[in-house]
Amino acid sequence: MRIEELDAEAAERELPALAAIMRACVEGGASVNFVLPFTQADSEAWWRRAVLPALRDGERRLLVARVEGRILGTVQLAFAPQPNQPHRAEVTKLLVHPDGRRLGLGRALMTRLEEMARASGRRLLILDTVEGSAAQRLYESLGWTLLGVVPRFALSTDRTVLGGSAFFWNELR
């Protein structure tokens, strides 16, 4: 496994792989702001619209996890835009392709992301995830603090359930 940072140009070259990870995760029920149907084209459009410009502008950083050269995981660090919060960032879109599960990719991505945040002068990180999910258990095992759960926060990908979202914070030392 290799964790690496992609800039906007590298991310654009890897767009099909990044979009495939997101599509596979959404199809598998991951609540990452999308509902079914969710196509490869939908995923690529989101990456082009939301991520690539933010990478170019320095508002976001992107990590990927490769296994035998194949990108199987990704996570993003979005810097707080508020002038009074230069110490804060949000962790977004921790995604691991089903083919990469149970290999420690999520943990490795989060560990590297925290190192990257520290090096960028960020000391307070926030994130949210589906209540009761494997991601929630991962964040708890990494020492993140549960702020609370907002009930009925977001629809499931199949639009049948309004599920709770667990909000976490982590003060980096």
Name each model feature, range by range.
Residues 43, 113, 118, 135, ...:
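Short secondary-structure boundary/hinge segments and terminal tails
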Residues 4-93, 97, 110-112, 116, ...:
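Acetyl-CoA-dependent GNAT
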Residues 2, 11, 89, 123, ...:
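C-terminal "cap" of GNAT-fold acetyltransferases
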Residues 103, 107, 111:
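Residues forming the Rossmann-fold NAD(P)(H) cofactor-binding site
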Residues 97-99, 103:
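Active-site acidic-Proline motif in GNAT/NAT acetyltransferases
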Residues 101, 118, 140:
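Short polybasic/polar patches that bind polyanions
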Residues 110, 117-130:
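Conserved GNAT acetyl-CoA-binding A-motif
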